[in-house]
Structures are given as C-alpha cells and as structure tokens.
Amino acid sequence: MPGTPVSDLSAATAVDATALLPLPVARPSAPAMVRGKLYIKTHGCQMNEYDSAKMADVLAASEGLELTDDPEEADVVLVNTCSIREKAQEKVFSQLGRWKALKAGGKPVIIGVGGCVASQEGEAIVKRAPYVDLVFGPQTLHRLPELIRARRESGKSQVDISFPEIEKFDRLPEPRAEGPSAFVSIMEGCSKYCSFCVVPYTRGEEVSRPFEDVLVEVAQLAAQGVREINLLGQNVNAYRGAYGADAGDAAQYADLGLLIRTIAQIEGIGRIRFTTSHPLEFSDSLVDAYRDVPQLANYLHLPVQAGSDRILSAMKRGYTALEFKSKIRKLRAVRPDISISSDFIVGFPGETEADFEKTMKLIEDVGFDQSFSFVYSRRPGTPASDLQDDTPEAVKQARLARLQAHINAHAASISQSMVGSVQRVLVEGPSRRDPNELTGKSENMRPVNFPGNPRLIGQFVDVLITEAMSNSLRGRIQLDDSAH
C-alpha cells in the first residue's frame, strides 16, 4: 500500500479528535414528522445489527419512517440476511412467504431483502418471490430511499447489489446514540478468502473508512452521551484508514492500534472494544495499544477456528496453532488477566479424531473464556464446498458438545474467581430480570446486575461482585468510588 503507515508514527502525530466535532458533515437531517412505519428483521452478526440500525436512520431521515415491532402495521418491511449458516436462503424465502400476506387486499407494502443472501442471490430472489420489491446488498443500503422511489414510480422490483467501495458512509445521516454503548463500522469486506467463508463474495474486498471520518462519528456519538465504542469490521484489525492526502500529498495510513489510541483521546469515551479480528492481522502495534491504552477493554475476540495445523491449512487461515499461541503470549505479557474468546468450526471436511484433539489441546493451553462454535456448514461457491466430508454427523455433534462443555466450564471458573473482586461496569439500563435493579457489562463482557439509582445509567461504576450466576454476575456498588 502506498504512503506512510501511521503505525510507524507516534500517537502524538494524530489529529486532535475533539476538534473534529464542529466540522460540517453533509448528511440529511431527521424529518419533522412521522410519515409511516418500518419493520426490520435482522439475522446474523453484529455488522448486520449495525447495518439494520443504519437502514432505520436512512429511512427515518428521508422517508419519515418510524420503527415498529409489528410487521402487520408497517409500510416497509425489510429482512437483513446472513449467509454464514447452512440453509440460509431457505430461511429467507420462508420469511418472505409469511410476509406475502401483508400485501393482501392491495395494501402498498414495500418488501425488501438486504444483507449477504441478497448479495449472493440477487435477481434470483425476485424470480422466485416476485412480490419482493427491493433487493440490496450491504454496500448499497444507503440507496434505499432511491430504490423505494424507483419501485413506486416504475412498478418494477429494484435490485442493487453492487460494491461501490465505501460510498455508503458518505450518504448516511448523523449517528444517533441509543444508550451509552454504540457500534462504529470502520471497514467493510474481507480479503482473506478462507476456504469455508462467503464474506469476500457477499461483502466484497477489504475497504477501510478514512481515519478522520471514523473520528468524526465517534466524536458525534460521544457528544450524545456514548461512553463505550465498539469498532466493527469483518476483519477489523486489517484497518488501514487513509489521512493526510490534502493538496496532492501522498496519503498516510492509520492502523487499528493508532485509531484506538486516538479515540481514547476523545472526551467522554471510557471504553473501547473491537470485533471481529483475524489472527494474521493481530500486530505488535495492537499489543502495544493493549499495554498503553487503559480504555481498551480487557477482552479480545480472536477466532482461531481449529487447533490442527493440517485443518488450518485446509481452511486457508494462514497461520499455525503455535503462531496463534505466540500472539496470545505477547498479549498476556502486557495484559495478564485478559479474557479471550474465539470461534471454532468442528467437523471441517477431513477432520480426524487426532485433529480434533489438537483443537482441544489448544483450548486447554490458551484457556478461552467464551466461544462461538459450530459444526461445519457447507456454503455453496466456497472452495471447501468441494472437499469430501465423510465424518458422521453424530461424531461432529459429539465433538461440538465436548468442546463447548470444556469452554463453558472454564468460563464458569473465571466467573467464580471474580467473586470478591471489584469490577468496572458501564451501566446500560434496568435489569431484565428485575427492573428495580441496574445492569451493565464488565470489562470481560459479563452481564452484572446490581441495585442502584437509574440516574447512574450511562456512567461507569465500581461494583463489588458478590455472586456468580450461570450467565451473569451479581454485586453491589462500591460507595467510596462509584462513578468515573
């Protein structure tokens, strides 16, 4: 990549992030009145959750649509799809079949399909379900108002699944905070082409948002009371955000480590997270950020997928189990008590019992706190879909159960070890278990429930952990130093 990588520069060279807030941003403002209802059904990852929120923002600003939980009362219904799991397409068409009745009696409901299944299927969705009005990809959600208008004017279904680089971020309304924690997408796509994965084909190659654009969005959210920023990307630690290209100068590039350092300088931001990472891109610069930036949460999600080098090679992951463990050792040298979660695929084509035992050995060596683990799901069009898969389903399910039981037991022991400790918790709102209590998350992503005044929502508090439950912690606020 041309230009100077910012990771080679000191953090002091970064722009003053707090000064970015007053900069004008050419984005549509919210309408003065509600002109209709919008229903969105979201499947899949946090990127899809983020995209769905942006769809709502775009349609609120341009069409005056207000979100509803009831598709029956909606004027526009959208499904934001995920294609990671098997039979994803069939699930989408089942959903669409249920929505077909919404048009009964001639009601002018707009039905749209977005996300990764839309990218994969395109026109085929309309051919199979001609009552679908819109098909759009993750990179064209900002064009929803234009697509809706074109559908109404022409009477024809509209399909736009192109990959227009990073254009959508220039066309989105200003971000709206919905609580003390917010997601910020910093890049799109993936260029790793793992043999089992559809993401490069559905979301395109890696494209990073410009450095200053990300900082503007974070500053806007901080001004609205956001205290925790979650940086998003399919391969978020491959971030290379251009900056400094004015007057024909060669652009420089900020890596994720420097982006984190700069966000930490923005007033009000007390915690930073990021997901999802790829071990190949887990650099020394990022390890240094964990060492130097206290706002960077004491938690890392780093998908390893398998512990067998033979299977990792077949997956085209680009690293060995030893190299993965080496990165973890470097990280724990600067954050000894960091919690690490991961992704695992069990039963990848050709996985033997010996391969699986190597995965279990890696799990034991690293001590993962949490996992997202699944039996291998064949995705059409990926290289792995051509591999012979002769492991019985019962064997795969037994391996998965054993893997999950091991990690869950370790996670329970970590939770138990937290009893008696004081944890810094961002208060998110009332507890779902007991609305008279508050809830928030610890640094290592554990829900913590505790008595407290609702006025603390949006603040960090120190909570003494008194009990470890199966999926959460209980505690009480430390009165001597309760808020930061």
UniProtKB/Swiss-Prot annotation:
Cofactor detail note: Binds 2 [4Fe-4S] clusters. One cluster is coordinated with 3 cysteines and an exchangeable S-adenosyl-L-methionine.
Uppermost EC category: transferase
MTTase N-terminal domain mapped to chain residues: 36-153
Top-level taxon of the source organism: Bacteria
Cofactor(s) needed for function: [4Fe-4S] cluster
Sites where the protein binds [4Fe-4S] cluster 2: C190, C194, C197
Residues in the signal sequence: none
Catalytic activity: N(6)-dimethylallyladenosine(37) in tRNA + (sulfur carrier)-SH + AH2 + 2 S-adenosyl-L-methionine = 2-methylsulfanyl-N(6)-dimethylallyladenosine(37) in tRNA + (sulfur carrier)-H + 5'-deoxyadenosine + L-methionine + A + S-adenosyl-L-homocysteine + 2 H(+)
Residue ranges annotated for the TRAM domain, each copy included: 416-479
Family: Belongs to the methylthiotransferase family. MiaB subfamily.
Protein name listed in UniProt: tRNA-2-methylthio-N(6)-dimethylallyladenosine synthase
Organism: Xanthomonas axonopodis pv. citri (strain 306)
